[in-house]
Amino acid sequence: AGKLHAIAQDLALIQAMGVKLVLVHGFRPQVNEQLQAKGHEARYSHGIRITDSVALDCAQEAAGQLRYEIEAAFSQGLPNTPMAGATVRIISGNFLTARPVGIMDGVDFQHSGLVRKVDTAGITRTLDMGALVLLSPFNYSPTGEAFNLSMEEVATSVAIELQADKLIFMTEVPGIRIQPGEPASDDNPIDTELPLAAAQALLKQLPPAQVPTDTGFYLQHCVKACKAGVERSHILPFKTDGALLLEIYVHDGIGTMVIDEK
């Protein structure tokens, strides 16, 4: 919760500088925690959660709880700063429709979904009103069926549809190292800038990503976004205080930026 409040303060500051923000939250740790409490195993395939009815209930509960926590974090303003008392207006809604993942390689993903459509006009109108748009990975099909999507899939799809200037992932990993897979050291620091061609070449060398700590997990989404017109995609560590501000406003940044240098 403390980290959420700090990130909310950074986002409030960035928005006050005139940046239009769409925030997509995840809920993977919360769902896994609930499943564990119920004695139910978390199952994945192809890097996607297999969402049975128990996992779907957990996802719905986590989505609701996180929305309240995020709205609370943004309602606290910035004490002891010139922005004390300033509130960020947050609007969330059914800006997305979902479709089922279906069956892949004989695996039935049940209630796991992908983005079917993004209401870009609705999101743009909301941003133009000066509000921050909050999106959840819990979404519905045109027939009202509930689906559990991944935060990465939602964020990437929305960034592409909006043709956003940046796609930023706040992640468990610090970024991508010069020598991926090798231990962190002075000789193997974070690669702060990765041209799109180099990122694509690296993806081909890596094994398919299955979990968020795999090097290629966020990189594949960064590459997808850059190929589709989003000029810059970033992988940042959420544990580092001020990571967003450092990445956006300091020349060398702090995580890894994938850039399309066209």
For each feature predicted by the language model, list its residue ranges.
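Glycine-rich beta-strand-to-loop/alpha-helix junction loops that act as flexible
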Residues: 1, 23-28, 172, 238
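Structural motif
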Residues: 1, 22, 102, 132-136, ...
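N-terminal glycine-/serine-/threonine-rich phosphate-binding loop
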Residues: 1-22
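Polyanion-binding loop/helix "lid" in catalytic or ligand-binding cores
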Residues: 7, 11, 50-82, 120-121, ...
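Ligand-binding beta-strand-loop-alpha-helix segment within the catalytic cores
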Residues: 32, 36-134
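Short acidic, glycine/serine/threonine-rich loops at helix termini
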Residues: 32-39, 100-102, 145-147, 178-183, ...
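Glycine-rich phosphate/pyrophosphate-binding loops
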Residues: 162-180, 233-236
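Long, charged amphipathic helices and adjacent flexible linkers at domain junctions
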Residues: 249-262
